[in-house]
Curated annotation (Swiss-Prot):
Residues 237-251 have a biased composition (Low complexity). GO terms for molecular function: guanyl-nucleotide exchange factor activity. PANTHER family: GUANYL-NUCLEOTIDE EXCHANGE FACTOR, PH AND SEC7 DOMAIN-CONTAINING PROTEIN 3. Residues 911-941 form a coiled coil. This is PH and SEC7 domain-containing protein 3. Residues 515-723 form the SEC7 domain. It comes from the Eukaryota.
């Protein structure tokens, strides 16, 4: 096509252009043609421009402003140099320039001018003469009834020109336009330039107008229609009115027009905040817009719009009456907010919105008559090359941020409106969100959960309110696809749901097909903001071409089944997973709790379905809990276990609604039983056990303000006390070898049933049994339990002397009834008698006079045991070894408890082995010794008054005894470590002899056995060994 190489044609100026306008236009021209690789800045239009990414194609260029005289029109329309001809049958065509208001207004601001085309072989003199002639009518037009509401430039003398005579004298030879139109200069250099955006498809806009029938009187009679641009209701176009007016009486000042449009945009933005974007405010309520795209007529009557498919392309829209429909501009659907403004004789066209819709393609349009006389037809055809470009997400983000920052500073010029392309913002944000999505299923069961389509996934985080608002305003999102003619359509519902599908055409009818169909095929994915809910379902539904673009009509027309948030799919999946968990189908017992205790909707569904396999009808609460815990291992974090128990409580209440008043009451008792089980049978509780009365007292007032039945609480307490709660373990753990578990001997096998020494009566259950620990000393010892935990006296039936073969192995003193054999495992009875020596102190029992060679061992929990040896040397050997082990391996104590009670309590002493080196351990003991000594001195400096209560005196004595004992213990620890520490743990020279004797039976060597003569009990033995007894305390120290 001729003229395709005219893109580099030098810029030609209108004689009346000012120097400032020329400089601005030059900068724009160089920017658009000389530096096309740079980032495209914002548009300068005050109400009809939209921010576009540099790669987005634009079939419908936008218009900006001009400054003085002929540049008064705000034009941002860019015609490519490769565009097809613009014909004027029977008239001479003139070459259009961006700075010519009188000519470009005919295309962009129809009420003022008639479109003209410039032949290539003629000069620009006819244009200058036209502008001069148009200026002559400025005063006459400016004096009309239409007044400016807002003036952009006080020094600019804006007017609209009459071109009927100039058009009649213009050349009638049709020619082709070859020039690319640079952006017209804006009001000030601060306003960003409008980008030249290449289009993808050929767009032919055919306008037929009767120029000879236009009279100034007719246009003058319709001025009131122009001014009354807020008029509502259907508008009927008079038959006598011509589509295009070139009369000076029907024109008005562009400044007045812009000011009115700015005011109108604010009004329309308030009336229809979702129907307008930043570039869609040019349409007036009293304006009729008529544009045909591929055989689809889009008719606008101010705020009324109708999109339809005419039976005949030659039908005239002038005599048609349209139903009332709000006007809007949707960047997603690419609605052309190009307005064909008809007020009697006046038509106003501003083709804008397609620049906002990336990937929109429109074919060449056939001519469509807009007038009835048909004497003169004006055709405007624009041809563009086919371009396909991909979005640059990061580049769009940076461009949008720059645009927002710039436009915030130009609010006084641009007025209210959107400052960025909502489609572009959403595309970048949407890609970012997709990158951060993940599945909510557990990692172990994801591959075995169920086989569903790949489209089932959900957002970890919901869409932000800003993105949701932009989606609702845009209505739909179109993204270019490589598939022929298909586009991604993304719509949002009122609840934040997003539906993506593929459409062979644009849903507002901009396609070759007579009826555009919105297809929801198998590729469609429905996203939901709420976590853990998703579904996809193929569906095909027709879309009303005239529906409001910013609304959610598309989703509202969907059936409720297709918008069920995927609940049905999740329920079915939860049922399948729950069934497999209950039957342990490719799951272990320890895996069940992981799937029931997660904090998401799907896990809750699985737990509810899992509990349906249990029937607790007629069972007591403790029986139901035991039955439930036998099915799986209740492991995991505390909150995960509690979630599982919540589901259990709900299920029990549904099966037994009359037993307990509420679900909360059931859950409260369930947790109370779990805590009671830990208190009575737990490994870490070495203090006083909870009594039944304390259990009842703790549950007062928690049954919805009332109390539970005491009989019920007593029954639950006795049930837990007599039989502790246990849950099932995996078969693999039961079959572990002794090297992996314990040295317990049971029926000749070594199943892992006890991994820690002792039993429920042994306070040192938290000490793991190490079969590989070193043996430091062994031999026969006679044991007598003198005091239980916290110094309480031992019951009378348990105070007798018993002979054991003792083995100091690691930090544990094992007491065996049978002879020692290294290959022999310890029995349950042996483990029950074991004593931990961490933080213990062994000393000679100076207060016990009934038997010789007796030493006393006071443990960390203040148990007191008496041991008798065969000789004084052996007694001292046991004392040294026990103290040395305690000094070397005892870890630093925990800080003292902080509470509101004034009652003294000893700090906890950890049973774990210290991780400090010997030097660090020595420093730790010395530091603790110094602290205890200082505290003891302060304590004794404030003795209790004689008038205080006896309870306070006992508290004082108890603390005094504790501090004194701790001081003595740390003094011995420090002295042991200074003497050598671990070196003292090596075997002495006389030790092998004792070890040899240990392999023989005590009955075969009665001389080596301790003296077992029966001694009459003394009253002093039955005394409490608590420190408050002065006599005992004096003897012990």
């Amino acid at each position: 096509m001729e003229g395709r190489n005219a893109a580099a044609e030098p810029f030609v100026w209108v004689n009346s252009a000012s120097a400032h306008s020329q400089s601005v236009a030059k900068a724009k021209y160089e920017f658009l043609f000389g530096k096309s690789e740079e980032k495209t800045p914002d548009s300068s239009d005050h109400g009809g421009s939209t921010l576009l990414p540099p790669t987005v194609t634009n079939e419908f260029p936008e218009y900006g402003t001009m400054e003085e005289g002929g540049e008064g029109l705000r034009a941002s329309l860019d015609f490519d140099a490769k565009s097809p001809p613009c014909r004027l049958p029977g008239q001479q065509a003139v070459h259009l320039l961006a700075g010519q208001d009188s000519i470009l207004n005919s295309v962009t601001e129809g009420p003022n001018d008639a479109p003209q085309c410039h032949p290539q072989e003629q000069s620009l003199q006819p244009i200058d003469s036209l502008i001069s002639a148009l200026k002559a009518t400025e005063a006459r037009i400016a004096s009309g009834t239409f007044q400016a509401t807002k003036v952009l430039d006080k020094d600019a003398n804006f007017s609209v020109y009459q071109v009927d005579k100039e058009l009649s004298t213009a050349s009638h030879k049709p020619q082709r336009a070859h020039r690319t139109f640079p952006v017209g200069p804006g009001k000030s250099p601060d306003i960003p330039l409008s980008a030249e955006v290449p289009t993808e498809e050929n767009l032919s806009l055919h306008i037929q107008e009767d120029l000879s029938a236009l009279l100034p009187e007719e246009a003058q009679a319709h001025r009131s229609q122009i001014t009354n641009y807020r008029r509502q209701g259907p508008l009927r176009v008079p038959e006598s009115a011509c589509p295009v007016s070139s009369s000076s009486a029907g024109s008005h000042n562009p400044v007045d027009r812009v000011g009115a449009l700015r005011e109108q945009r604010s009004d329309l933005g308030r009336e229809h905040p979702r129907g307008y974007d930043r570039g869609g405010s040019m349409g007036r309520q009293g304006r009729i817009k008529h544009v045909e795209f591929q055989g689809v007529e889009i008719l606008w009557t101010g705020e009324e719009a109708e999109s339809r498919h005419p039976p005949e392309r030659t039908a005239s829209p002038v005599s048609k009456e349209f139903a009332k429909r709000p006007s809007h501009s949707s960047p997603a659907c690419g609605v052309c907010s190009t307005s064909t403004h008809l007020t009697g004789d006046v038509w106003d066209e501003t083709c804008k919105a397609p620049s906002e819709r990336p990937g929109t393609s429109a074919g060449t349009l056939s001519p469509m008559p807009l007038g009835e006389s048909g004497e003169d037809d004006v055709f405007l055809r624009e041809s563009k090359e086919h371009l396909e470009e991909n979005f640059a997400i990061q580049g769009d983000k940076e461009r949008i941020l720059d645009q927002e920052e710039h436009l915030r500073g130009d609010d006084d010029i641009l007025g209210p409106g959107y400052t960025e392309d909502s489609t572009d913002v959403y595309s970048s944000q949407f890609e970012t969100i997709l990158d951060n999505t993940s599945l909510y299923y557990s990692a172990e069961s994801l591959e075995t959960l169920y086989s569903e389509p790949d489209s089932y996934f959900s957002f970890e985080m919901p869409l932000t309110p800003m993105i949701q608002q932009r989606i609702k305003e845009g209505g739909q999102f179109l993204e270019r696809t490589s598939v022929g003619g298909q586009h991604d359509v993304l719509s949002v519902s009122a609840d934040g749901g997003i539906v993506m599908g593929y459409s062979a055409g644009i849903t507002n009818g901009l396609h070759d097909s007579a009826n555009s169909v919105y297809t929801r095929g198998p590729q469609e994915i429905a996203f939901w903001g709420s976590r853990d809910r998703c579904f996809a379902e193929g569906k095909t539904t027709g879309v009303d071409a005239g529906s409001e673009m910013g609304s959610t009509d598309i989703l509202e027309k969907e059936t409720t089944e297709s918008l069920s948030n995927g609940t049905n799919s999740n329920v079915e999946a939860a049922k399948r997973l729950a069934k497999r968990l209950y039957h342990l189908d490719r799951f272990k017992r320890s895996d069940v709790a992981k799937h029931l205790g997660k904090n998401n909707e799907f896990s809750k569904l699985v737990a509810e379905e899992y509990l349906k396999f249990f029937d607790f009808t007629g069972m007591t609460l403790d029986q139901s809990l035991r039955y439930f815990l036998k099915a799986f291992s209740l492991v995991g974090e505390t909150q995960e276990r509690e979630r599982v128990l919540i589901h259990f409580s709900n299920r029990y209440f549904s099966c037994n609604p009359d037993t307990i008043t509420s679900k909360d009451g059931v859950h409260c008792l369930t947790c109370a039983m779990m805590l009671l089980n830990t208190d009575l049978h737990g490994h870490v509780n070495i203090g006083k056990k909870m009594t039944c009365q304390e259990f009842i007292t703790n549950l007062q007032g928690v049954n919805e303000g009332g109390d539970f039945s005491k009989d019920l609480l007593k029954a639950l307490y006795n049930s837990i006390k007599n039989e502790k709660l246990e849950w099932a373990v995996d078969d693999e753990e039961k079959k572990k070898s002794p090297s992996e578990g314990t040295d317990e001997k049971a029926n000749g096998t070594h199943p892992k049933t006890i991994s820690r020494i002792g039993s429920t009566t042994n306070p040192f259950l938290d000490i793991p049994h190490d079969p590989n620990a070193a043996v430091y000393k062994s031999g026969f010892l006679a044991r007598k339990i003198h005091a239980d935990m916290d110094g309480k006296k031992t019951p009378r039936g348990k105070r007798g002397w018993k002979t054991f073969y003792a083995v100091l192995k690691g930090t544990v003193l094992y007491l065996q009834k049978d002879e020692y054999k290294p290959e022999k495992s310890l029995s349950d009875e042996d483990l029950k008698n074991a004593v931990s020596v961490h933080h213990a102190l062994a000393s000679k029992a100076t207060d016990y006079e009934k038997k010789p060679n007796v030493f006393k061992l006071k443990t960390a929990d203040w148990r007191v045991l008496l041991f008798q040896t065969q000789s004084p040397e052996e007694m001292q050997g046991w004392i040294n070894k026990i103290n040395c082990v305690a000094a070397v391996f005892s870890a630093p104590p925990f800080p003292a408890a902080i509470g509101s009670q004034k009652k003294f309590s000893r700090p906890l002493l950890p049973a774990t082995t210290t991780k400090l080196s010997q030097e660090e351990q020595l420093k730790s003991h010395e530091s603790k010794l110094k602290q205890i000594t200082t505290e003891l001195a302060e304590h004794r400096s404030y003795p209790p008054d004689k008038k205080v209560k006896a309870k306070d005196v006992d508290e004082y004595k108890l603390k005094d005894h504790y501090l004194e004992f701790e001081k003595t213990r740390y003094e011995i620890y420090v002295s042991v470590l200074k003497e050598g520490g671990k070196e003292l743990l090596t075997t002495d020279g006389n030790e092998p002899v004792g070890l040899k004797k240990s392999h023989s039976s005590p009955s075969l060597n009665p001389d080596a056995s301790p003296v077992t003569a029966k001694v009459k009990r003394n009253v002093s033995e039955r005394k409490d060994h608590r420190p408050e007894t002065p006599g005992i305390k004096q003897k012990v120290t």
